[in-house]
Amino acid sequence: MIFKKEVSKEDVECVETLLMMSNSKPTREEYNKLQLCILRRNKSSTITTPSTVMESKSHIHDHSLRESPTRRSRNRHDLPPMSPPMEQRKSKKAKRSTDASSSKTREPTPGWLISLMRSKNGGDVEDNSKKIIDKELFQTDVDPHQSRLSIPVSQIVELEFLNHEEKRAIEEDANRVRKEGVDAILVDSHLREFPVNLRLRDMRGILLYNLVAGWNQVVTDCLLEENTNIRLWSFHADDTLYFALVPLYAN
């Protein structure tokens, strides 16, 4: 048989103190109050019956359900900040993508290059120029022992700059240990001409065009150095492949 007995004042104080401590980090005052409640309860002769325990649990549950909005709000504010909205993250990603591809835009062909193409093509004013790349030269690009300008295929602005015969020569080179490449002429803005050779290489899965042969002379005569920014164009005249080099000096 179960006897009901009223919950003692000490028990109620203990429960209320525990409830406050469960919702947030206990303060020193709350901790001391709990210790005092326990001491008082131990000194009390009140006997707790099963029904008393059930009533105490019910009392705790009711208090939890009636938790004040202020306390709930405080707990929410303790949470770490939420991640940015999906639209904001997409916007940032798009901005990075735009920044990364900004060097792949097509600027107008320089006037001196149009005049050169006209003279090479017998007065024909058709602009068949292709923008190849904007690039900051690395140390290896100006190293005389390397003797080549590296052009990553993934960074080329207009990929269709080779004619049919040149493409076939590049494809046949793929199975050769000693590359033959495609002969070309590089012209600078002073209209100086340098014989060069274009070759395609696969560097561990990364496709690179290399300008070789006369590249060291280009570096010397055009005063190219590491960190120099250049823009490279191409065009055809009488079925000959030309490259046009434009150093991009800071203002």
Swiss-Prot record:
Compartments where found: Nucleus
Residue ranges for the DNA-binding region feature of this UniProt entry: 153-249
Keywords: DNA-binding, Nucleus, Transcription, Transcription regulation
Biased composition (Basic and acidic residues): 56-70
Listed GO MF terms: DNA binding
GO cellular component: nucleus
Keyword Nucleotide-binding: no
Alphabetized Pfam families for the sequence: At2g31720-like
Region: Disordered, residue numbers: 48-111
Protein's name in the database: B3 domain-containing protein At2g24670
